[in-house]
């Protein structure tokens, strides 16, 4: 059925800043600081960056927090993902963040492409946390678990339970199907595209918790507080682009499987979702019309 909601206009506020990226990927708030991940275009390549600023509604003065030394060749690859979450790694506080890899060519183990990385706040030291990721669009972290969502090729969108130093298979294993039969390499060569392994574990890759056979255009994943609804206890929400829907999810013990999911049709591509404490509601970033949607169990004045 159609969602019923009260309309509330939100007047946008323009905040002055010294921030001028080529492509913004994600924003994240931590202890009155705003972190922004983005890609920058160099002379003939793209690199990945994170800047931060003390949050101020009048003006934001950004400083660089992280800049990749690796630069991806123009017209071959641009950084994707860029999702960020707080994480404590060996008692060091920092950020987990994702750098996607839409290309089928295997990357060196020391490349940041197709990885989830950790960088600590104090020294900005970079650690590869996990690898074998295609295009990680959603990231969730708390004291109990790290979860990610990942676009597959022509199907095979994944929900993954992330563990340190594990390999999740891309570009060798996927439940999706190849686009075309050739791989383009930046040295102007073409290679036959191999078929993807469907059983990740045969080659010691980590299996996803769940994979959608048909692509939903998977995006963000969040946990819903139990006070949102008595009927949604210990539930997660997953957003989607292609399906224009939310998916309410219940995981099993130890997050090794999904017990059930419920599809909730919204009718627009949902790029991002966040829970808002004061509203006790879920805010949706609706892509096609540039709108914000709110789902709440109480009346909005």
Residue positions per predicted region:
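Beta-propeller domains
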Residues: 1-15, 57
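Surface loop/turn motifs at the tips and blade-to-blade linkers of beta-strand repeat domains
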Residues: 14-20, 66-76, 127-132, 211-213, ...
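Beta-rich catalytic cores
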Residues: 20-25, 30, 46, 78-80, ...
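Asp-box/WD-like beta-propeller blade repeats and closely related beta-sheet repeat scaffolds
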Residues: 22, 44-88
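Residue-level marker for isolated small/hydroxyl-bearing positions within beta-strands
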Residues: 35-39, 98-100, 149, 239, ...
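Beta-propeller domain segments
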Residues: 94, 101-259, 278, 291, ...
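Conserved blade-ending motifs and adjacent loop-strand segments that build the rim/top face
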Residues: 256-277
């Amino acid at each position: 059925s159609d969602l019923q909601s009260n309309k509330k206009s939100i007047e946008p506020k323009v905040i002055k800043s010294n921030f001028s990226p080529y492509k913004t990927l994600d924003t994240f708030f931590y202890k009155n600081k705003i972190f922004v991940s983005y890609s920058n275009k160099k002379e003939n390549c793209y690199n990945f960056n994170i800047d931060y600023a003390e949050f101020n509604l009048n003006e934001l003065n950004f400083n660089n927090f992280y800049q990749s030394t690796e630069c991806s060749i123009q017209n071959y690859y641009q950084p994707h993902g860029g999702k960020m979450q707080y994480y404590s790694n060996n008692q060091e506080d920092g950020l987990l963040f994702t750098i996607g890899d839409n290309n089928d060519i295997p990357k060196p183990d020391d490349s940041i492409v197709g990885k989830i990385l950790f960088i600590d706040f104090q020294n900005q030291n970079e650690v590869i946390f996990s690898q074998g990721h295609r295009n990680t669009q959603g990231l969730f972290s708390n004291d109990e678990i790290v979860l990610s969502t990942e676009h597959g090729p022509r199907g095979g969108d994944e929900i993954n339970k992330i563990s340190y130093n594990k390999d999740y298979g891309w570009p060798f294993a996927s439940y999706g199907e190849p686009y075309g039969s050739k791989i383009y390499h930046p040295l102007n060569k073409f290679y036959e595209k191999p078929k993807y392994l469907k059983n990740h574990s045969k080659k010691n890759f980590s299996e996803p918790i769940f994979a959608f056979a048909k692509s939903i255009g998977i995006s963000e994943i969040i946990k819903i507080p139990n006070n949102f609804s008595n009927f949604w206890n210990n539930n997660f929400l997953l957003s989607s682009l292609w399906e224009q829907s939310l998916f309410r999810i219940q995981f099993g013990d130890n997050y090794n499987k999904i017990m059930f999911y419920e599809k909730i049709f919204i009718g627009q591509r949902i790029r991002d979702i966040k829970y808002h404490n004061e509203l006790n509601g879920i805010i949706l970033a609706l892509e096609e019309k540039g709108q914000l949607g709110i789902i709440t169990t109480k009346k909005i004045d």
